[in-house]
């Protein structure tokens, strides 16, 4: 009787089953760290969870004791009369927040072929909040990074002096700026200039100062669209989790199953790894920013004083760091334990 392992349909089903079960492990790590410094807090600290009874409520509150607070706690403390509301208090409240997501997965679609996928997204935000003034004037700064794919330009030549070091991707980026500027400006179609500006109450008119073609609101989305696979038509400076893309490393160790390799080598490993990180080196908020809605707003033009459309973020640098480590590598161990390594 023919063994089951020799039947074609059985081998096919084995291969299909292996592909369906190729995910060997998945790991997800999420860290959300928040801290607050609140000068001018007046109530005394009690013995039970740090609480004391003040008028109408315990202070600083069980939400504070168990770390379940956010920036809105400053409004709560002010409304309860816990803060020293005096212009002589020059030290603002400060908050620091870090969000870090790490996703890892190991795949083995066929025997001896292992693929490690990893994706991460990290954002840090620091705020300085002048709670003693009306409107809680706030300044903000931070950093941002996430994994992406930028293979479209990875193998593009750098050109030469004869063609002015021409880059097709850079040309695509430059040509897209006008289109992105128009799309950003279209978001202000029904906007009204905010109070406290020279044009307060009037409908937005680009003739008074439109979106800057070379501002970060335009150039960063155009840059991501041209150089990465996550850009698309989005206008986000800080891409969301939905646009997170993985990097990877690949290792194949099955060549020693072949007779010639098995006779000469103890092990033969073929390696490949790819890494691409989009990063906002640092950003800060404009001191003259006035919000219109959903993060859109206006800043004062340094020359005319007119309000011009802008997000609140003044971004100094963005970058995409891409590397193959290696593009192709071979690790060899001979029968006499001599090792050799080739990488490109």
Which role fits each region the language model picked out?
Residues 1-344:
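Exposed, low-structure sequence patches enriched in small/polar residues
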